[in-house]
Amino acid sequence: MGKYKKFFAIAVCSLLLFTVYFYRDPDRVITKGNNIILSPADGTVEYIKFYENGNPEVFKDGNCYVLNVSRYFPNGCYVVGIFMSPLDVHVNRAPIGGRIVYIKHIDGSFYPAFLEGVEKINERNIVIIKNGSEYVGVVQIAGFVARRCWLSIKEGECINMGQKIGMIKLGSQTAVIIPANYNITVKVGERVYAGQTIIAVKRTDN
């Protein structure tokens, strides 16, 4: 019996340590500057796509989701998808400062991942931030393991660049929607850090 108690104690301690590690929220020195867009998440750049018609999409777990935010990006936009592993810090931060003009939450499906013949839908949040005449978007996409993403902001709120805006649990993705008049400064496979890595710079010919 003592052997089982020891095993149980080790398992509980391991789970507790993992939980504390997963929910860690380390202090960050936020990168400052004008005409830049910061990464909203820690992770690895998974894809970079350009949409000429301004109607962007995001991709997760084999699914493609149209975001229906083309009214904010009439001249086209880039979408940078950032994969967040369970070992990454999962706190999301604002890529720019500005005012929250749009938030939309889409519920995910709660069917078991192994069930066939059922459309599996990732829970996600879409956030649009306005700064001057420009808009930048952040999309939280939860994985099927946890299916949980939440925001600590609301529409109409003014936020600062690098401010914490929410969190996603376990394996997940954060995407950022960037106006077409910016140059992307990261590459697929590159590591990025929320509030610190510059992922786009406004072109000077505009």
Curated annotation (Swiss-Prot):
It comes from the Archaea. Its main location: membrane. It is found in: Cell membrane. Its EC number is 4.1.1.-. Heterodimer of a large membrane-associated beta subunit and a small pyruvoyl-containing alpha subunit. Is synthesized initially as an inactive proenzyme. Formation of the active enzyme involves a self-maturation process in which the active site pyruvoyl group is generated from an internal serine residue via an autocatalytic post-translational modification. Two non-identical subunits are generated from the proenzyme in this reaction, and the pyruvate is formed at the N-terminus of the alpha chain, which is derived from the carboxyl end of the proenzyme. It catalyses: archaetidylserine + H(+) = archaetidylethanolamine + CO2. One of its GO terms (molecular function) is phosphatidylserine decarboxylase activity. Belongs to the phosphatidylserine decarboxylase family. PSD-A subfamily. The modification Pyruvic acid (Ser) is found at S172. Catalyzes the formation of archaetidylethanolamine (PtdEtn) from archaetidylserine (PtdSer). Binds 1 pyruvoyl group covalently per subunit. InterPro entries: PS_Dcarbxylase, PSD-A. This is Putative archaetidylserine decarboxylase proenzyme. The active site is at S172 (schiff-base intermediate with substrate). The record marks G171, S172 as: Cleavage (non-hydrolytic). Keywords: Cell membrane, Decarboxylase, Lipid biosynthesis, Lipid metabolism, Lyase, Membrane, Phospholipid biosynthesis, Phospholipid metabolism, Pyruvate, Zymogen. It is a peripheral membrane protein. One of its GO terms (biological process) is phospholipid biosynthetic process. The keyword Acetylation does not apply. Its cofactor is pyruvate. GO terms for cellular component: plasma membrane. The gene is asd. It comes from Methanocaldococcus jannaschii (strain ATCC 43067 / DSM 2661 / JAL-1 / JCM 10045 / NBRC 100440). PANTHER family: ARCHAETIDYLSERINE DECARBOXYLASE PROENZYME-RELATED.
